Amino acid sequence: MAQLFFRYGAMSSGKTIEILKVAHNYEAQGRKIALMTSGLDNRSGVGTVASRIGIHRKAIPITEEMDLFEYIKEMNNHDLADGDGKLACVLIDEAQFLKRHHVLECAKIVDEFNIPVMTFGLKNDFQNHLFEGSENLLIFADKIEEMKTICHYCGHKATMNLRINNGKPVYEGEQVQIGGDESYYPVCRYHYFHPNVVR
């Protein structure tokens, strides 16, 4: 039975490497996948899944108005008509940027087509608010898994994302800010509030 998965973690927890690995494993077995990512993320070009260690590949960009259920239905029907067989899996990177309707469409893909949907993304933003996509995945996903990484400052488990601009922590501003001069670091709770304190 297919399931809707949400794998979340702080910045630099290996989410993108993991999704690329899963895609490779399916394709190495001759299975067809749909690799998708947020159309908002243009750091490496729209429709590109790119890891920090330099591995990247093209993906289907998800727009705000896109109906994922209808898109996958059409893709699946086209593949069946061409004799390629149905999709084995839908993989979505940067899932925090999904809208509620996208998450519900993912659940419908799982329930009606029996195709697993694996989503990867951040849980909370730099202000420690849930992203819309993450909040709805926490509600509707069948399986939720945390991907762990360590604090940029002390090496303890990181659970938060700290935005830094000109060497100073930023706690206010737009939730989504792609391509600016800011840097984001995975941090523990203590260093989220005290980034300049050595422990």
Curated annotation (Swiss-Prot):
Keywords of the record: ATP-binding, Cytoplasm, DNA synthesis, Kinase, Metal-binding, Nucleotide-binding, Transferase, Zinc
Parts of the chain that traverse the membrane: none
Protein name per Swiss-Prot or TrEMBL: Thymidine kinase
Active site feature: E94 (proton acceptor)
A GO MF label: thymidine kinase activity
Family stated for the protein in its record: Belongs to the thymidine kinase family.
An example Gene Ontology CC term for this record: cytosol
Keyword Lipoprotein attached: no
Residue numbers binding ATP: G9, A10, M11, S12, S13, G14, K15, T16, D93, E94, A95, Q96
Enzyme Commission number(s) of this protein: 2.7.1.21
Annotated compartments: Cytoplasm
GO BP terms: DNA biosynthetic process; thymidine metabolic process
Assembly and binders: Homotetramer.
SUPFAM superfamilies: Glucocorticoid receptor-like (DNA-binding domain), P-loop containing nucleoside triphosphate hydrolases
